[in-house]
Amino acid sequence: MSRYTGPSWKQSRRLGLSLTGTGKELARRNYVPGQHGPNNRSKLSEYGLQLAEKQKLRFSYGLGEKQFRNLFVQATKIKEGTLGFNFMVLLERRLDNVVYRLGLATTRRQARQFVNHGHILVDGKRVDIPSYRVDPGQVISVREKSMKVPAILEAVEATLGRPAFVSFDAEKLEGSLTRLPERDEINPEINEALVVEFYNKML
Protein backbone atom coordinates (compact mmCIF):
# COMPACT_ATOMS: atom_id res chain seq x y z
CA MET A 1 0.00 0.00 0.00
CA SER A 2 1.46 3.31 -1.09
CA ARG A 3 1.62 6.44 1.00
CA TYR A 4 -1.59 8.49 0.91
CA THR A 5 -1.12 11.74 -1.02
CA GLY A 6 -4.72 12.90 -1.32
CA PRO A 7 -6.50 15.76 0.48
CA SER A 8 -5.48 15.75 4.14
CA TRP A 9 -8.72 17.43 5.23
CA LYS A 10 -10.91 14.63 3.86
CA GLN A 11 -8.61 11.96 5.30
CA SER A 12 -8.59 13.74 8.67
CA ARG A 13 -12.38 13.65 8.81
CA ARG A 14 -12.40 9.98 7.86
CA LEU A 15 -10.00 9.16 10.69
CA GLY A 16 -11.40 11.63 13.20
CA LEU A 17 -7.89 13.03 13.68
CA SER A 18 -6.21 16.24 12.54
CA LEU A 19 -3.35 15.28 10.21
CA THR A 20 -2.17 18.86 9.79
CA GLY A 21 -1.96 19.49 13.51
CA THR A 22 -4.19 22.56 13.26
CA GLY A 23 -7.54 20.93 14.04
CA LYS A 24 -9.20 23.02 11.31
CA GLU A 25 -10.25 19.92 9.38
CA LEU A 26 -12.58 18.83 12.18
CA ALA A 27 -13.77 22.24 13.33
CA ARG A 28 -16.81 22.37 11.05
CA ARG A 29 -17.48 18.73 10.18
CA ASN A 30 -16.17 16.14 12.61
CA TYR A 31 -17.79 13.20 10.82
CA VAL A 32 -16.55 11.11 7.91
CA PRO A 33 -16.96 12.31 4.31
CA GLY A 34 -20.13 11.01 2.64
CA GLN A 35 -22.10 10.80 5.88
CA HIS A 36 -25.26 12.87 6.20
CA GLY A 37 -24.45 14.22 9.61
CA PRO A 38 -22.47 13.08 12.66
CA ASN A 39 -25.03 10.53 13.89
CA ASN A 40 -24.78 8.07 11.00
CA ARG A 41 -21.40 6.55 11.88
CA SER A 42 -21.71 2.76 11.85
CA LYS A 43 -20.41 0.73 14.79
CA LEU A 44 -17.04 -0.88 14.08
CA SER A 45 -16.11 -4.48 14.79
CA GLU A 46 -13.10 -5.31 16.97
CA TYR A 47 -10.99 -5.70 13.83
CA GLY A 48 -12.42 -2.45 12.47
CA LEU A 49 -11.43 -0.59 15.63
CA GLN A 50 -7.89 -2.00 15.47
CA LEU A 51 -7.58 -1.17 11.78
CA ALA A 52 -8.90 2.36 12.30
CA GLU A 53 -6.42 3.01 15.12
CA LYS A 54 -3.55 1.68 13.02
CA GLN A 55 -4.58 3.92 10.15
CA LYS A 56 -4.83 6.95 12.44
CA LEU A 57 -1.26 6.43 13.62
CA ARG A 58 0.08 5.60 10.16
CA PHE A 59 -1.49 8.60 8.48
CA SER A 60 -0.38 10.86 11.33
CA TYR A 61 3.23 10.17 10.37
CA GLY A 62 2.48 9.97 6.65
CA LEU A 63 3.99 6.54 6.06
CA GLY A 64 3.16 3.82 3.58
CA GLU A 65 1.93 0.52 4.96
CA LYS A 66 5.12 -1.42 4.19
CA GLN A 67 7.38 1.15 5.83
CA PHE A 68 5.04 1.44 8.82
CA ARG A 69 4.86 -2.34 9.31
CA ASN A 70 8.63 -2.74 8.99
CA LEU A 71 9.13 -0.18 11.74
CA PHE A 72 6.70 -2.11 13.93
CA VAL A 73 8.76 -5.26 13.36
CA GLN A 74 11.87 -3.35 14.45
CA ALA A 75 10.03 -2.31 17.61
CA THR A 76 9.33 -5.97 18.46
CA LYS A 77 13.08 -6.53 18.77
CA ILE A 78 13.51 -3.93 21.54
CA LYS A 79 13.75 -5.83 24.82
CA GLU A 80 12.91 -3.06 27.29
CA GLY A 81 9.60 -1.23 27.65
CA THR A 82 6.24 -1.93 26.03
CA LEU A 83 5.92 -2.74 22.35
CA GLY A 84 3.34 -0.08 21.54
CA PHE A 85 5.28 2.74 23.16
CA ASN A 86 8.59 1.56 21.67
CA PHE A 87 6.95 1.66 18.25
CA MET A 88 5.76 5.22 18.79
CA VAL A 89 9.22 6.31 19.93
CA LEU A 90 10.72 4.90 16.73
CA LEU A 91 8.19 6.94 14.76
CA GLU A 92 9.16 10.03 16.73
CA ARG A 93 12.85 9.51 16.02
CA ARG A 94 12.43 9.69 12.25
CA LEU A 95 14.31 12.69 10.86
CA ASP A 96 11.26 14.12 9.10
CA ASN A 97 9.31 13.96 12.35
CA VAL A 98 12.08 15.65 14.36
CA VAL A 99 12.25 18.42 11.74
CA TYR A 100 8.49 18.85 12.22
CA ARG A 101 8.75 18.79 16.03
CA LEU A 102 11.46 21.47 15.90
CA GLY A 103 9.09 23.74 13.99
CA LEU A 104 11.17 23.84 10.82
CA ALA A 105 8.09 22.65 8.91
CA THR A 106 4.37 23.14 9.47
CA THR A 107 3.48 19.52 8.68
CA ARG A 108 5.30 16.20 8.55
CA ARG A 109 4.66 16.07 4.82
CA GLN A 110 6.44 19.39 4.38
CA ALA A 111 9.25 18.22 6.68
CA ARG A 112 9.70 15.15 4.48
CA GLN A 113 10.01 17.38 1.42
CA PHE A 114 12.63 19.55 3.13
CA VAL A 115 14.69 16.47 3.97
CA ASN A 116 14.30 15.01 0.47
CA HIS A 117 15.42 18.29 -1.08
CA GLY A 118 18.61 18.38 0.95
CA HIS A 119 17.76 21.36 3.16
CA ILE A 120 18.50 19.53 6.43
CA LEU A 121 21.81 18.68 8.12
CA VAL A 122 22.47 16.19 10.91
CA ASP A 123 25.62 17.00 12.88
CA GLY A 124 26.71 19.23 10.01
CA LYS A 125 26.25 16.62 7.28
CA ARG A 126 23.43 16.65 4.76
CA VAL A 127 20.97 13.80 5.21
CA ASP A 128 18.21 13.41 2.61
CA ILE A 129 16.61 10.26 4.03
CA PRO A 130 13.37 11.05 5.92
CA SER A 131 13.49 7.72 7.79
CA TYR A 132 16.96 8.42 9.22
CA ARG A 133 16.81 7.63 12.95
CA VAL A 134 17.82 10.55 15.13
CA ASP A 135 19.63 9.96 18.43
CA PRO A 136 19.25 12.30 21.41
CA GLY A 137 21.92 15.00 21.26
CA GLN A 138 22.37 15.02 17.49
CA VAL A 139 22.16 18.54 16.05
CA ILE A 140 19.53 19.06 13.37
CA SER A 141 20.07 22.24 11.37
CA VAL A 142 19.23 23.96 8.11
CA ARG A 143 21.86 24.00 5.38
CA GLU A 144 23.40 27.46 4.99
CA LYS A 145 22.15 27.81 1.41
CA SER A 146 18.63 26.99 2.61
CA MET A 147 18.44 29.34 5.58
CA LYS A 148 16.43 31.90 3.61
CA VAL A 149 13.92 29.48 2.12
CA PRO A 150 10.59 31.27 2.76
CA ALA A 151 8.68 28.12 3.70
CA ILE A 152 11.21 27.27 6.42
CA LEU A 153 11.26 30.79 7.85
CA GLU A 154 7.45 30.95 7.79
CA ALA A 155 7.22 27.62 9.61
CA VAL A 156 9.59 28.77 12.36
CA GLU A 157 7.68 32.02 12.77
CA ALA A 158 4.33 30.21 12.91
CA THR A 159 5.43 27.69 15.55
CA LEU A 160 3.94 28.69 18.90
CA GLY A 161 5.39 25.93 21.04
CA ARG A 162 7.59 22.86 20.92
CA PRO A 163 7.60 19.58 22.88
CA ALA A 164 9.69 19.46 26.05
CA PHE A 165 11.90 16.75 24.57
CA VAL A 166 13.40 19.03 21.89
CA SER A 167 15.46 22.23 22.05
CA PHE A 168 15.66 24.86 19.32
CA ASP A 169 17.68 27.97 18.52
CA ALA A 170 15.59 30.15 16.20
CA GLU A 171 18.53 32.38 15.25
CA LYS A 172 20.74 29.49 14.19
CA LEU A 173 17.82 27.44 12.82
CA GLU A 174 19.08 24.38 14.64
CA GLY A 175 17.93 22.13 17.42
CA SER A 176 18.08 18.64 18.79
CA LEU A 177 16.16 15.80 20.33
CA THR A 178 17.33 16.30 23.91
CA ARG A 179 15.83 13.04 25.17
CA LEU A 180 13.35 10.38 24.16
CA PRO A 181 9.73 11.42 24.71
CA GLU A 182 7.49 10.15 27.50
CA ARG A 183 4.21 8.50 26.58
CA ASP A 184 2.06 11.42 27.70
CA GLU A 185 4.04 13.79 25.48
CA ILE A 186 3.10 12.20 22.14
CA ASN A 187 -0.17 11.35 20.42
CA PRO A 188 -2.49 11.17 23.45
CA GLU A 189 -5.40 10.48 21.08
CA ILE A 190 -3.86 7.17 19.95
CA ASN A 191 -4.52 3.84 21.67
CA GLU A 192 -1.34 2.02 20.66
CA ALA A 193 -2.57 -1.23 22.25
CA LEU A 194 -5.08 -1.56 19.40
CA VAL A 195 -2.27 -1.13 16.87
CA VAL A 196 -0.27 -3.88 18.59
CA GLU A 197 -3.33 -6.17 18.58
CA PHE A 198 -3.81 -5.52 14.86
CA TYR A 199 -0.26 -6.45 13.90
CA ASN A 200 -0.08 -9.39 16.31
CA LYS A 201 -2.82 -10.97 14.22
CA MET A 202 -1.16 -10.06 10.93
CA LEU A 203 2.48 -10.99 11.59
From Swiss-Prot:
It comes from the Bacteria. PROSITE patterns: RIBOSOMAL_S4 (PS00632), S4 (PS50889). The keyword Lipid biosynthesis does not apply. One of its GO terms (molecular function) is structural constituent of ribosome. One of the primary rRNA binding proteins, it binds directly to 16S rRNA where it nucleates assembly of the body of the 30S subunit. With S5 and S12 plays an important role in translational accuracy. Belongs to the universal ribosomal protein uS4 family. This is Small ribosomal subunit protein uS4. The gene is rpsD.
